[in-house]
């Protein structure tokens, strides 16, 4: 046998041995000691090195829903060499996040999370101890005080209502003007400005200058943000990708750096005018708490205020923008639904006054539409990933401490065991008593904001804001597209899934003022 052949054979043997050793090492690393009476969550075989990253594809929520039908509500995959437990099914998720909430309240230590407010984000930080819990309560109280709490200086029922009415009326005028002058518009670029001004007013007591550089940077950067913190982002599980050319990751880093600088500047400017006897917004409330507690070793030093404001801004911004944009697309796709909402608004409110938050209970079809929007689109397909805080079990399966957990909200909202015709858009499914009352039991099955100890702190203000924006828009406007225009509702995957761009939306006045 020639020397070259021996050399080739030797090389192949070395390569085969190396591959075997790598596979053996990975398998050994992944193997955990399962307590007696419990089982390891089932799942498909993955590829060496890659795991199931190819299985997830471009739409992980759909791929994992399909796997749940085969392996059940508790299954395990690998992304790279990292094991991930995927939870589906409403009962299973409630058991984990509510009844066993302390076991599943952690956050995995993912690379993308470390880039958000320098790794100090209350929402994305792995910390879930007493200090985190206290700051979360403080953030909730501040958000409640300057959103859903009553405003003694205004005729509106609360601060949120006052801000939304102003911005919604401005949006109505702007959409009418664009339709009259241009003939059509792209909704998200119009909606996002109004929503940003609402959350800006609640956080800082002021609106952002319209079309300013800061506003445009926030709008552009928000899409980069949601793309990079979605469940299954490869950069979190394959460290080498952090060092290779990655335009998406670069934009994500730049957005976070710039947004923190923007918040630091805005918070510092706010502090110059701070008057603890006249608190008008969330940041002022946080300043007051910091001032009152600094002598007693308080829970929130001033340098943490930027981090909390960042989380609150995010909680009230992207979700609301996406919900309103999707609503407009759904209404032009199902014009009969829009007509029913118009009829309800005309009957209950009329045209002599504007809708208020207090009208919600009297507008069941509007509420049913919003619930079906959340369920049908499931535009937050997964919660932000969780992790286990200790060794635990679920449905007879052993889940060790620090295991990354994906919560598949999209599966819950399209589960054929829970919903009749889950892929049909039908707001009436939520109505009872001759379509006059919301079915509370069914409405509580819709998942969009998570559950348990990590439930989105902005859920209630976000729901109120979506309702009031839509009620004011639909009282005054009729949305349509030119004949023959097709609206594509296929979403692009991310932390929040975005609809395809549609530049041909029209908004026509329903009556003369």
UniProtKB/Swiss-Prot annotation:
Catalysis performed (reactions): an organic molecule + reduced [NADPH--hemoprotein reductase] + O2 = an alcohol + oxidized [NADPH--hemoprotein reductase] + H2O + H(+); 17beta-estradiol + reduced [NADPH--hemoprotein reductase] + O2 = 2-hydroxy-17beta-estradiol + oxidized [NADPH--hemoprotein reductase] + H2O + H(+); 17beta-estradiol + reduced [NADPH--hemoprotein reductase] + O2 = 4-hydroxy-17beta-estradiol + oxidized [NADPH--hemoprotein reductase] + H2O + H(+); estrone + reduced [NADPH--hemoprotein reductase] + O2 = 2-hydroxyestrone + oxidized [NADPH--hemoprotein reductase] + H2O + H(+)
Keyword terms, alphabetized: Endoplasmic reticulum, Fatty acid metabolism, Glycoprotein, Heme, Iron, Lipid metabolism, Lyase, Membrane, Metal-binding, Microsome, Monooxygenase, Oxidoreductase, Steroid metabolism, Sterol metabolism
List of residues binding substrate: 225
One Gene Ontology cellular component annotation held by this UniProt entry: endoplasmic reticulum membrane
GO terms for biological process, alphabetical: arachidonate metabolic process; cholesterol metabolic process; estrogen metabolic process; hormone biosynthetic process; progesterone metabolic process; retinol metabolic process
GO molecular function annotation: estrogen 16-alpha-hydroxylase activity; estrogen 2-hydroxylase activity; heme binding; hydroperoxy icosatetraenoate dehydratase activity; iron ion binding; steroid 17-alpha-monooxygenase activity
Subunit architecture: Interacts with PGRMC1; the interaction requires PGRMC1 homodimerization.
Stated name of the protein: Cytochrome P450 1A2
Organism, scientific name: Mesocricetus auratus
Top-level taxonomy: Eukaryota, Metazoa, Chordata, Craniata, Vertebrata
Gene it is expressed from: CYP1A2
